[in-house]
Design a protein with these regions (language model features):
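Intrinsically disordered, low-complexity regulatory regions
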Residues: 199-446
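N-terminal alpha-helical interaction blocks
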Residues: 1-109, 175, 179-191, 234-237, ...
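Basic, glycine-/proline-tolerant helical and adjacent loop/strand elements
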Residues: 65-207
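Intrinsically disordered, low-complexity boundary segments flanking structured domains
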Residues: 6, 55, 136, 158-159, ...
Length: 477
């Protein structure tokens, strides 16, 4: 095998993430440039870190890295409850995990990941989310494990360096952009080194992998690029996997927001609204991470959409938005719909119809509450539009009224009608506030307004301190 082809990159998300972690640890731009000498050096780093974590006292920060290993490799030599706590005795067992394949000694099998010749078979204790050695019905016929070549074995144990890890789970990235994949791995290698030195107590409690992905995408590309996050725990009794994805146009949306002050203002308003504090004033949910999560759609459908969250903010009467704030949030919603969903919307005539009807009523607040209740329901909205259209006609409206032909995209049960109705509400709320119709129960706080204006001058998708981590060099291990 040539010097620059010692490590393959496959389509398997865990092996792929591990291969990029190996490249980051070796200081290479991509896994294709990893040499046999690099594999040796990375193997030595992994062995040293595993042994140190597995033999560390429970009250030390090093033990936090053992928790990571336990979540990924239960019952391995490094995590078994009956393991030795003598580093000298444990080291040979860990080194043996990454021993050279010796095809001359017997039968060779194609590696499960890259199809290279392999003489070692592994099962769940060493491979996250794979079957145990007892599940012979799911394993290759007559083989008590999955064949794994040396390069892929090292990659699978370098995985936690390139993943976003917690004490109980790991998150890896699959991405069409190699630049984003490399950036994600490098940031997480730095973070992993910090966990080993300071433990999880030394890390921001509200940080999330989605924030790191958005920062990587922002720096990598402005074109089309799909990303997938795989979050999992390789538990003995109840392993689980959660998959979330971004749409391919999200990088274009990020670039548009980052280059536009009103959109940055809208994003920072969204972040601030999602920040949560406990009774002592400590942050328990970071707004940056929670906002980033809205751009990821769960495979099982259990995720909050960005447009839905923006609608809740604009419809909540307890929130005090200035005209500028409301315009920024509405513009953010329209930009997302246009950039990510490819929606072309001209809702101003219908929005004007509803705003006129609300404003000209004897109780604008009452009519607004009526519209708020009907806004997302196709049937209720259709009924309200008929009512508004008829009332304004009877009152002798001097402006042209949007007729039923313009209502169709909003009240039919068709693709993107729900999103259209949310955007309509956003535009109606902006028109009402521009006209001075009271919407919220509170007035906007001038101090908060100044803070948001200052935030709007900053990048929207910064790495939130990840770039401040010192670069890790293998010589420090």
């Amino acid at each position: 095998m040539g010097e620059v082809s010692a490590l393959a990159v496959t389509g398997h998300p865990l092996q792929r993430a591990g291969a990029w972690a190996v490249a980051a640890l070796a200081g290479r731009d991509d896994p294709g440039r990893v040499s046999e000498a690099d594999l040796e050096a990375v193997s030595a780093v992994v062995v040293a870190d595993v042994v140190a974590a597995a033999t560390a006292p429970k009250d030390t920060s090093r033990y936090d890295w053992w928790k990571v290993l336990f979540a990924l490799y239960p019952n391995s030599k490094a995590t078994h409850s009956k393991r030795t706590f003598d580093p000298a005795a444990l080291r040979p067992d860990i080194e043996n995990l990454f021993a050279q394949d010796r095809p001359e000694d017997g039968r060779t099998l194609p590696c499960t990941f890259c199809s290279a010749k392999a003489t070692v078979v592994w099962a769940k204790s060493n491979l996250p989310l794979f079957d145990t050695s007892k599940a012979l019905n799911a394993l290759p016929p007559g083989i008590a494990g999955w064949p794994v070549c040396r390069g892929c074995r090292i990659a699978m144990w370098a995985l936690p360096y390139g993943a976003w890890v917690t004490a109980g789970s790991a998150t890896v990235l699959s991405c069409e952009s190699e630049t984003a994949q490399r950036d994600f791995a490098r940031r997480n290698v730095r973070r992993a080194r910090r966990v080993m030195h300071a433990g999880f107590t030394g890390m921001p409690a509200t940080a999330r992998p989605e924030t790191v992905v958005l920062a990587a995408l922002r720096d990598a590309t402005e074109g089309l690029c799909a990303t997938t996050l795989w979050t999992f725990k390789n538990d003995n009794q109840d392993p689980w996997l959660r998959v979330t994805r971004t749409r391919r146009a999200v990088p274009a949306f990020l670039a548009t927001v980052d280059g536009n002050a009103p959109l940055r203002r809208g994003w920072h308003l969204l972040r601030r609204s999602l920040t949560r504090y406990d009774a002592q004033g400590r942050t328990v949910a970071g707004g940056a991470g929670e906002a980033a999560r809205l751009l990821f759609e769960a495979e099982d459908g259990r995720s909050r959409p960005l447009l839905g969250q923006l609608h809740r903010l604009l419809a909540d009467t307890d929130d005090a938005w200035s005209v500028g704030d409301r315009e920024a949030l509405a513009r953010l919603a329209f930009t997302y719909a246009e950039e990510v969903f490819g929606m072309e919307t001209d809702l101003e005539p219908v929005a004007t119809l509803i705003a006129d009807w609300i404003e000209q009523g004897t109780s604008p607040r009452g009519r607004l509450a009526e519209y708020r209740n009907a806004a997302l329901n196709d049937y209720k909205l259709g009924t309200l539009l008929i009512q508004a259209y008829t009332r304004l006609q009877l009152d002798g409206s001097k402006t042209p009224l949007a007729g039923p032909e313009l209502w169709k995209p909003l009240i039919r049960r068709q693709s993107r009608a729900w999103e259209q109705r949310m955007l309509l509400f956003a535009q109606v709320s902006v028109l009402l506030q521009q006209r001075g119709v009271p919407i919220g129960a509170k007035e906007a706080d001038p101090q908060q307004e100044r803070e948001i204006e200052a935030l709007a001058e900053r990048p929207a998708f910064a790495g939130d301190g990840e770039d401040e981590y010192d670069d890790y060099e293998m010589g420090q291990a």
